[in-house]
UniProtKB/Swiss-Prot annotation:
It is linked to Immunodeficiency 97 with autoinflammation: An autosomal recessive disorder with variable features. Affected individuals have childhood-onset antibody defects, cytopenias, and T lymphocytic pneumonitis and colitis. Some patients may have features of hemophagocytic lymphohistiocytosis. This is Phosphatidylinositol 4,5-bisphosphate 3-kinase catalytic subunit gamma isoform. It is an enzyme of class 2 (transferase). The gene is PIK3CG. Residues 962-988 are annotated as: Activation loop. ATP binds at residues 829-838, 864-872, 961-969.
C-alpha cells in the first residue's frame, strides 16, 4: 500500500500501529541518507582478562535510531561478550553515560531522544577523518558529599532548590542545567583573572561638554594615599592608570620610604583603588572614562585613591566542574529529509517528522477538580482552549458549560483549525476556566470561540499553559494532569497577570489548586519538529522588482510609526508581501516579524529564509530600543529573539547595567528556560563582577516574588553562582545572612507596634536591644551593600538606628564603613523595608538614570539623584539614605508649623542657613534650578503622581530630588473624591521664590529654568521609542501601575508624539504656566498632608 501525501495523515495514532507495520517504503534509494549504519567503537568500563586495557565493542549503529536505543544496543553487546557480564547484569543502561572527546574536552551524549545521525561527535569525526569514532560507556556515580554540601549552599543563596523536580512534567530544568555548563565554562576560561578580580567600572562614551568645562588647563588632580601620607599629582584626562602609576613612581623614586613603599617594589606591584570603596582604576582606559572620576568631576569632589596591592585572582577560583560538557547539538532534531516517514521501511522508523502530520491538532478535555467550590453554587463552568504564539492567538475552542461542582467531567475532544504540522516551536496550549450564571452561558457555542457578548458575562478563574513542542523539539503526547493558577483578586498581585499568564510552569501548590486532566494524541514514536534548512526563496527577487512608488511610500510610513501604533491587517499584508524591502530597514524588523503568520509552516520557513539574509541588520548601528522590542512579549520565536541578543553583544558593561532590569524581565517572555537571552545574561554576569552582583539580586528577588517563573530564574542563577568564583559566593552569603537577620528584626518590631503610625520609646528600645544581640553574635563583620557593591558596611552604629514612623515600620539603620581607607567617619545609611514591593521604585530610578545618560549626550547635567534602591526578596528591600537631605515638609514645619506650606520664603531661608557663604548659597540656588528642572521634566514624562511635601527632598547643597514612586503614568490618587494632581508637575511658589520670582514675574534664574526644561524635554523626545519600549516591557511584568496599553499611551501623550519641535517646546512652556497658575493648589494639598498626617509615603525614605 502506498501513501498519498495530500490525502491522509502519515503518522497514525497508536491504535493504527499494526496497519503502519504493513506499509512498504516507496523506494529504497530515498531512504539511504537516513538509514545508513554508522560504525562506532565503544570503550567499555570493564577490562580485558589478560591486560588492564578496557574492553571495546565495534557496533554498526542505525543513523535514524536514537541515543537511548544506541545505549541499549551497546549494553546488550556487553552482556553477550564481556568477560564481566555479571557487572552489566547488575546495572541497566540507565546506569551509564556516553562520553566522547573533542579538542581535549569530554562531552556527554546527554539527550536520550536525539537521533544518532544528528550527533555533534559524528560531524567532528568526519571533519577530523576519524573512522570509526570512539564513544566511552562510563558508569554513572552518585554525587559526592562535598558536591551535595555545595548544592545545599547554592540552594540557600538562590532561595529555591533546582534539584527538586516534584513540580515538573518533563526534564527541561535538568536539561537546561546541563546545557548552561558549556557557555559558563567558556566564559570562565576566557575572562582575564586580574581584570575580573578588580572589575573596573568604565565607559567609552565621550566626556560630556559640561564635565570638560570643569577640567582646568587639561589637568586633573589626583590625591594618592599610602599609609598615613598622601601626595597630590597632576595628570592628563587621557592618561591611563598605568601611566599615572609610572609617573608617580618616577616622581617618588627617592622618597619611597615617605610613602611606606619598599625599595624593591615598583609600579608593577601596585594598583589604584578609590579610598573607602572597592573600586579600582586599572587597565588601558583613559582616567576620564572611569565612572568614579566622572562622579567626582560632576560633584566638584577631589579624587582620592589609595596605592594598594592588587587582589589575588586565586580568590575567584571556580569549583571544578563535575558535569561533562554537552554540545550545542544536544536536543536538536534532524532535517525533514532525515526524519520523514515517506519512502522508508516503517518497521525501521524510530522518530517521525512533525511535517508529515497532516491532521488537525486536538485535545481531549477530561475534566477539572477543584478543592474549594465558590460560595455561589448557582454557577456553570466551561474550559476555553487557545493555541497561542507570543501574543498571537492561532486558534481557539471551548467546551460546553456544565454546573460548577467539585468535579466536572466533559470527556470531549476539541479539534482545532490548525494542523499538527503547522504548530510552531514555542506554541502554548492555553487552558482557561471560566464561570458564570447559568443563563449567561449557552451550550450552543460549544467548541467555538466565545462571543464578546457571552465573554462579558463570565469570569476567568483559573489558567495553565502547556508547551506543545517541548525543549527537545518533540510534540507532547499522552495524558497530563495540570495544576492551574488562580486569577488574583484586586490588589498588587493583579498587575503581574499579563506576564504570569505566559508561563508554562504549573502551580506547585497541588493540595489547594484547581487541576485539569487532558489527553493529547499518543503516537507509536516520538514526533519531532525538524530543523529548518535554509533554502533560497524564489519569490524574493520577483517581489523586490515589483514595488511601485506609492506602495513604497506607504511602507515607509508604516515603518516610521512608533511602537504603540497598532498594525492593521492591510499593514501586515503589505509588510509581508514586501518583506525583502522591509529587510533593508532595521526599524521595520519588529513590525515585519509581527506580521508573520506563525501558525503556517510554509510562512515560518520563508521567515527563516529572511533571517538568513539579515546583513543590513547585522551591519547597522545598535539601537537599544529597537533591539529590545524584539525581546518583548510579542515575539516567541527563538530565532527572532536570538538576532536581538546577538545585537546586544556589542553593549558595553555600563549599558548592560542600564538595561539589566528590563533584560531580566524579558526572560519571562522566552518560551523555554535555555535561551540566547539567558546565556547572554549569564556570560555578561560572569565577565564583570558589578553586572554579576546586580544580576544575582534581580534574579533572587524574582525567585522570591514570582512563583510562575521561579524555576527559570533559579536555573539561570545557579549557572551564574557556579561560575562567579569563591570570593563572590562569600560576599553573597554575607549579604543574604544580613537580610534574613534584619527581616526577622523587622517582623518582630512590626508585631510590637501593629498598624500604628507612631513609634513608642519601648519599640525603639526593643530595636536597639535586638540590634545589639545581632551585633554581638551572628551579624557578619562586614558585607557589600546590595544597592552599591563598591561599598562595604561594617558594624552597626546602634545609637543612630531607629524605627520610622509609618505603617510598614521600616528600619533606619546606620553602619560604619568597613574600609579603613575611608576618608571620613560618615556612616552608610540604609532604610530596610518589609511589606512594600520596591520593584516599581527600582524601575523609575533606572529610567531616571537612562534619562541622565540621554541628557549627558546633549551636555546637560540635570543633577538628578537616583539614590540606591533594591528589592532583595518578597516585599523586602533596601533604600539608600541620602546624606544631608531632608523633606520639604520637615523644612516647612520646622519654622512655622503646618502653615509653613503657605510660606513662600521658608525654603529659601533654609538654603541660606545651610550655606556658610554667599558664594555657596548662589551655587546651591544654581543646583536647585537644574535639579528642579530635571525632576519637573522627568516626573511629567513618567506621570509620577502623588507628589507631596513628604516625598520631595532637598540636600543642603540645593539638590532637589523626588522619592517614593508608588504612582506612575497618571495613576494618581484622589482625596475626598477630588483628584489631588491638578498640575502637570510640582513647581510651587516656594520653589519659584528660590529662583527669585513670584506670580507671573520672571528672573534670570527662572529664565534659565525654562531654557533647561525645554532642552531636557526635547532631548527625551528624540528617544521616545526607547522610553515607550522600556515601559512596554515592564507592562507585562508585575507592576501594579502598568497593566494596559493605555498606561503606556500616557508617555506618548506627554512627549507629544507627532508634533514638531516648535509645538513641543510651546506645549511644555504652557505646562510651566499651568503650574505657576495653580501652585496654590499644591500648597493646599501639602497643608492637608501636614495637618491630617496623610501617610502616602515614608518620611525620609531616601
Amino acid at each position: 500500500m502506498e501513501l498519498e501525501n495530500y490525502k491522509q495523515p502519515v503518522v497514525l495514532r497508536e491504535d493504527n500501529c499494526r496497519r503502519r507495520r504493513r506499509m512498504k517504503p516507496r523506494s529504497a534509494a530515498a531512504s539511504l541518507s537516513s538509514m545508513e549504519l554508522i560504525p562506532i567503537e565503544f570503550v567499555l568500563p570493564t577490562s580485558q582478562r589478560k591486560c588492564k586495557s578496557p574492553e571495546t565493542a565495534l557496533l554498526h549503529v542505525a543513523g535514524h535510531g536514537n541515543v537511548e536505543q544506541m545505549k541499549a544496543q551497546v549494553w546488550l553487546r556487553a552482556l553477550e561478550t564481556s568477560v564481566a557480564a555479571d557487572f552489566y547484569h547488575r546495572l541497566g543502561p540507565h546506569h551509564f553515560l556516553l562520553l566522547y572527546q573533542k579538542k581535549g574536552q569530554w562531552y556527554e551524549i546527554y539527550d536520550k531522544y536525539q537521533v544518532v545521525q544528528t550527533l555533534d561527535c559524528l560531524r567532528y569525526w568526519k571533519a577530523t577523518h576519524r573512522s570509526p569514532g570512539q564513544i566511552h560507556l562510563v558508569q554513572r556515580h552518585p554525587p559526592s558529599e562535598e558536591s551535595q554540601a555545595f548544592q545545599r549552599q547554592l540552594t540557600a543563596l538562590i532561595g529555591y532548590d533546582v534539584t527538586d523536580v516534584s513540580n515538573v512534567h518533563d526534564d527541561e530544568l535538568e536539561f537546561t542545567r546541563r546545557g548552561l555548563v558549556t557557555p559558563r565554562m567558556a566564559e570562565v576560561a576566557s575572562r582575564d583573572p586580574k581584570l575580573y578580580a578588580m572589575h573596573p567600572w568604565v565607559t567609552s562614551k565621550p566626556l560630556p561638554e559640561y564635565l570638560w568645562k570643569k577640567i582646568a588647563n587639561n589637568c586633573i588632580f589626583i590625591v594618592i594615599h599610602r599609609s598615613t601620607t598622601s601626595q597630590t599629582i597632576k595628570v592628563s584626562p587621557d592618561d591611563t592608570p598605568g601611566a599615572i602609576l609610572q609617573s608617580f613612581f618616577t616622581k617618588m623614586a627617592k622618597k619611597k620610604s615617605l610613602m611606606d613603599i619598599p625599595e624593591s617594589q615598583s609600579e608593577q606591584d601596585f594598583v589604584l583603588r578609590v579610598c573607602g570603596r572597592d573600586e579600582y582604576l586599572v587597565g588601558e582606559t583613559p582616567i576620564k572614562n572611569f565612572q568614579w572620576v566622572r562622579h567626582c568631576l560632576k560633584n566638584g569632589e577631589e579624587i582620592h585613591v589609595v596605592l594598594d596591592t592588587p587582589p589575588d585572582p586565586a580568590l575567584d577560583e571556580v569549583r571544578k566542574e563535575e558535569w561533562p560538557l554537552v554540545d550545542d547539538c544536544t536536543g536538536v532534531t534532524g532535517y525533514h529529509e532525515q526524519l520523514t516517514i515517506h519512502g522508508k521501511d516503517h518497521e525501521s522508523v524510530f522518530t517521525v517528522s512533525l511535517w508529515d502530520c497532516d491532521r488537525k491538532f486536538r485535545v481531549k478535555i477530561r475534566g477539572i477538580d477543584i478543592p474549594v467550590l465558590p460560595r455561589n453554587t448557582d454557577l456553570t463552568v466551561f474550559v476555553e482552549a487557545n493555541i497561542q504564539h507570543g501574543q498571537q492567538v492561532l486558534c481557539q475552542r471551548r467546551t460546553s458549560p456544565k454546573p460548577f461542582t467539585e468535579e466536572v467531567l466533559w470527556n470531549v475532544w476539541l479539534e482545532f483549525s490548525i494542523k499538527i504540522k503547522d504548530l510552531p516551536k514555542g506554541a502554548l496550549l492555553n487552558l482557561q476556566i471560566y464561570c458564570g450564571k447559568a443563563p449567561a452561558l449557552s451550550s450552543k457555542a460549544s467548541a467555538e470561540s466565545p462571543s464578546s457578548e457571552s465573554k462579558g458575562k463570565v469570569q476567568l478563574l483559573y489558567y495553565v499553559n502547556l508547551l506543545l513542542i517541548d525543549h527537545r523539539f518533540l510534540l507532547r503526547r499522552g495524558e497530563y494532569v495540570l495544576h492551574m493558577w488562580q486569577i488574583s483578586g484586586k490588589g498588587e498581585d493583579q498587575g503581574s497577570f499579563n506576564a504570569d499568564k505566559l508561563t508554562s510552569a504549573t502551580n506547585p501548590d497541588k493540595e489547594n489548586s484547581m487541576s485539569i486532566s487532558i489527553l493529547l494524541d499518543n503516537y507509536c514514536h516520538p514526533i519531532a519538529l525538524p530543523k529548518h534548512q535554509p533554502t533560497p526563496d524564489p519569490e524574493g527577487d520577483r517581489v523586490r522588482a515589483e514595488m511601485p512608488n506609492q506602495l513604497r511610500k506607504q511602507l515607509e510610513a508604516i515603518i516610521a510609526t512608533d511602537p504603540l501604533n497598532p498594525l492593521t491587517a492591510e499593514d501586515k499584508e503589505l509588510l509581508w508581501h514586501f518583506r525583502y524591502e522591509s529587510l533593508k530597514h532595521p526599524k521595520a524588523y519588529p513590525k515585519l516579524f509581527s506580521s508573520v503568520k506563525w501558525g503556517q509552516q510554509e510562512i515560518v520557513a520563508k521567515t527563516y529564509q529572511l533571517l538568513a539574509r539579515r546583513e543590513v541588520w547585522d551591519q547597522s548601528a545598535l539601537d537599544v530600543g529597537l533591539t529590545m522590542q524584539l525581546l518583548d512579549c510579542n515575539f516567541s520565536d527563538e530565532n527572532v529573539r536570538a538576532i536581538a541578543v546577538q545585537k546586544l553583544e556589542s553593549l558595553e558593561d555600563d549599558d548592560v547595567l542600564h538595561y539589566l532590569l528590563q533584560l531580566v524581565q524579558a526572560v519571562k517572555f522566552e518560551p523555554y528556560h535555555d535561551s540566547a537571552l539567558a546565556r547572554f545574561l549569564l556570560k555578561r554576569g560572569l565577565r564583570n563582577k558589578r553586572i554579576g552582583h546586580f544580576l544575582f539580586w534581580f534574579l533572587r528577588s524574582e525567585i522570591a516574588q514570582s512563583r510562575h517563573y521561579q524555576q527559570r530564574f533559579a536555573v539561570i542563577l545557579e549557572a551564574y553562582l557556579r561560575g562567579c568564583g569563591t570570593a563572590m559566593l562569600h560576599d553573597f552569603t554575607q549579604q543574604v545572612q544580613v537580610i534574613e537577620m534584619l527581616q526577622k528584626v523587622t517582623l518582630d518590631i512590626k508585631s510590637l507596634s501593629a498598624e500604628k503610625y507612631d513609634v513608642s520609646s519601648q519599640v525603639i528600645s526593643q530595636l536597639k536591644q535586638k540590634l545589639e544581640n545581632l551585633q554581638n553574635s551572628q551579624l557578619p563583620e562586614s558585607f557589600r551593600v546590595p544597592y552599591d557593591p563598591g561599598l562595604k558596611a561594617g558594624a552597626l552604629a546602634i545609637e543612630k538606628c531607629k524605627v520610622m514612623a509609618s505603617k510598614k515600620k521600616p528600619l533606619w539603620l546606620e553602619f560604619k564603613c568597613a574600609d579603613p581607607t575611608a576618608l571620613s567617619n560618615e556612616t552608610i545609611g540604609i532604610i530596610f523595608k518589609h511589606g512594600d514591593d520596591l520593584r516599581q521604585d527600582m524601575l523609575i530610578l533606572q529610567i531616571l538614570r537612562i534619562m541622565e545618560s540621554i541628557w549627558e549626550t546633549e551636555s546637560l547635567d540635570l543633577c538628578l539623584l537616583p539614590y540606591g534602591c533594591i528589592s532583595t526578596g518578597d516585599k523586602i528591600g533596601m533604600i539608600e539614605i541620602v546624606k544631608d537631605a531632608t523633606t520639604i515638609a520637615k523644612i516647612q514645619q520646622s519654622t512655622v508649623g503646618n502653615t509653613g506650606a503657605f510660606k513662600d520664603e521658608v525654603l529659601n531661608h533654609w538654603l541660606k542657613e545651610k550655606s556658610p557663604t554667599e558664594e555657596k548659597f548662589q551655587a546651591a540656588v544654581e543646583r536647585f534650578v537644574y535639579s528642579c528642572a530635571g525632576y519637573c521634566v522627568a516626573t511629567f514624562v513618567l506621570g509620577i503622581g502623588d507628589r507631596h511635601n513628604d516625598n520631595i527632598m532637598i540636600t543642603e547643597t540645593g539638590n532637589l530630588f523626588h522619592i517614593d514612586f508608588g504612582h506612575i503614568l497618571g495613576n494618581y490618587k484622589s482625596f475626598l473624591g477630588i483628584n489631588k494632581e491638578r498640575v502637570p508637575f510640582v513647581l510651587t511658589p516656594d520653589f519659584l521664590f528660590v529662583m527669585g520670582t513670584s506670580g507671573k514675574k520672571t528672573s534670570p534664574h527662572f529664565q534659565k529654568f525654562q531654557d533647561i526644561c525645554v532642552k531636557a524635554y526635547l532631548a527625551l523626545r528624540h528617544h521616545t521609542n526607547l522610553l515607550i519600549i522600556l515601559f512596554s516591557m515592564m507592562l507585562m511584568t508585575g507592576m501594579p501601575q502598568l497593566t494596559s496599553k493605555e498606561d503606556i499611551e500616557y508617555i506618548r501623550d506627554a512627549l507629544t508624539v507627532g508634533k514638531n519641535e516648535e509645538d513641543a517646546k510651546k506645549y511644555f512652556l504652557d505646562q510651566i504656566e499651568v503650574c505657576r497658575d495653580k501652585g496654590w493648589t499644591v500648597q493646599f494639598n501639602w497643608f492637608l498632608h501636614l495637618v491630617l498626617g496623610i501617610k502616602q509615603g515614608e518620611k525620609h525614605s531616601a
